């Protein structure tokens, strides 16, 4: 199934390549976005986090980055010595991260989920943990993390009914993805039920609420901090 998935991903990439080239010519900053998305991250862009046991937190766009902000603040407060990497997919998400997450040691565009790209980026960064926000689970990236025994914790997890139907088509891959995640921190009991029905281990599922509404960046309890520290090693 991975072969079929990768053939589809590579085919889709070449189909949209002319559009990417056009945007690179016409849109300021898009060349950097594509360079990083294809794994061409410069050493100086990740020197503060690469091979230093960083915490890698990923949010696709503006909404996910807003949800990421209070989490980053609490991690920085609890573990100031650990570098933090934040990644985003969209230009809006990237710009928002630079505006509201000054605590991050590095901010990059997320690598495309092509096997050679994911493998290269994970090998260069080697985070201590990867924390995708909401439903940002990508097969090749998770596979590269799993092969290096790097834990994955989903935060602010959200699964829609439409997503449930879509993920069921990823048989042979979806089970691997779920088994790679060591903890599912879901927004609601409904989201928890969805991820459970999709095959996640119930003992790994927690309902933690939606961090997007955590506007005051409330203090976490000592028990929460101890659990985070244990999970992060």
Where are these regions (language model features)?
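Active-site and donor-binding regions of nucleotide-sugar-utilizing enzymes
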Residues: 17-220, 227
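Short, intrinsically disordered, charge-balanced linker/junction segments flanking boundaries
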Residues: 229-233
């Amino acid at each position: 199934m991975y072969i079929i998935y990768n053939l589809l991903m590579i085919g889709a990439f070449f189909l949209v390549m002319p559009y990417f080239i056009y945007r690179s010519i016409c849109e300021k900053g898009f060349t950097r976005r594509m360079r990083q998305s294809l794994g061409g991250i410069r050493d100086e862009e990740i020197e503060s986090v690469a091979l230093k046991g960083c915490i890698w937190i990923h949010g696709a766009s503006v909404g996910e980055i807003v949800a990421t902000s209070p989490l980053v603040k609490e991690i920085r407060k609890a573990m100031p010595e650990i570098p933090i990497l934040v990644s985003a997919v969209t230009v809006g998400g990237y710009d928002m991260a630079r505006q509201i997450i000054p605590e991050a040691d590095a901010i990059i565009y997320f690598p495309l989920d092509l096997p050679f790209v994911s493998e290269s980026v994970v090998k260069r960064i080697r985070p201590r943990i990867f924390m995708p926000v909401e439903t940002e689970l990508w097969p090749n990236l998770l596979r590269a993390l799993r092969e290096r025994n790097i834990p994955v914790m989903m935060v602010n997890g959200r699964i829609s009914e439409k997503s449930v139907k879509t993920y069921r088509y990823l048989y042979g891959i979806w089970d691997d993805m779920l088994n790679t995640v060591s903890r599912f921190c879901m927004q609601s009991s409904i989201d928890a039920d969805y991820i459970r029905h999709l095959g996640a281990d119930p003992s790994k599922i927690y309902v933690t609420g939606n961090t997007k509404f955590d506007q005051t960046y409330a203090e976490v309890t000592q028990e929460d901090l101890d659990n985070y520290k244990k999970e992060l090693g």
